[in-house]
Design a protein with these regions (language model features):
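Membrane-embedded transmembrane alpha-helical bundles that form the catalytic cores
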Residues: 1-199
Length: 199
């Protein structure tokens, strides 16, 4: 769903109306639900499995890291999280690039064997959210931020729909209050937000 399409703007307006109808303490839930709907409308539903794996792996690894008193064990969880999250991105986005290079090598050595391309469909915003979760895991490991204890809030941080379309890659420390704290309806801020989307 393009941010310049009528459907996106209709979706955004409905999302805003629902967001401000709900009590402030539940507004983050509205953001999560609208992000899930947006994801479902924008790409094949089965690609959501990759996003769910990223959410679960990031949540588990971040919270395991903080429990470890041994730095090496904490680093183990950091590495596991990065390998899983980056691995999904690499396989989905770059496996065909690797296959092409292998096929070129086969040709150079006179081999007729060719490996077929794989038809992967990557989730919306995979590059953005992968870089974001890696930065989050590094910040948790470095003690810059504490890990989010609520997996649904972690899901919102990773899958927040305005960021899935065009970024930016945001730090958890910068985003958590904006996502999880309630907000009062302020027309000037909504107008400013619309300007930022367009320009």
């Amino acid at each position: 769903m393009s941010i310049t399409s009528y459907i996106f703007w209709l979706f955004l307006i409905v999302s805003l109306l629902v967001y401000y109808v709900f009590p402030q303490k539940l507004q983050w839930v509205v953001l999560l639900v609208t992000s899930i709907f947006f994801f479902g409308l924008s790409c094949e539903l089965y690609t959501g499995i990759y996003l769910l794996i990223t959410i679960f792996a990031t949540y588990v690894c971040a919270n395991k890291m903080i429990l470890e008193t041994d730095q090496l064990k904490a680093k183990k969880w950091l590495i596991i999280g990065i390998v899983i999250d980056a691995g999904i991105l690499i396989v989905l986005k770059y496996s065909n690039f690797g296959i092409e290079n292998v096929n070129v090598l086969f040709s150079v050595f006179g081999l007729k064997k060719q490996i077929s391309h794989i038809s992967w469909l990557a989730p919306l915003g995979i590059s953005y959210y992968t870089m974001q979760v890696i930065a989050y895991l590094v910040d948790v490991y470095g003690g810059v931020v504490k890990p989010e204890k609520n997996i649904l809030k972690t899901a919102l941080f990773i899958g927040y729909y305005p960021q899935l379309t065009s970024g930016p890659i945001a730090k958890f420390a910068e985003m958590k209050d904006q996502l999880y704290s309630g907000h009062k309806l302020e027309i000037d801020k909504i107008a400013y937000g619309c300007q930022r989307i367009l320009w």
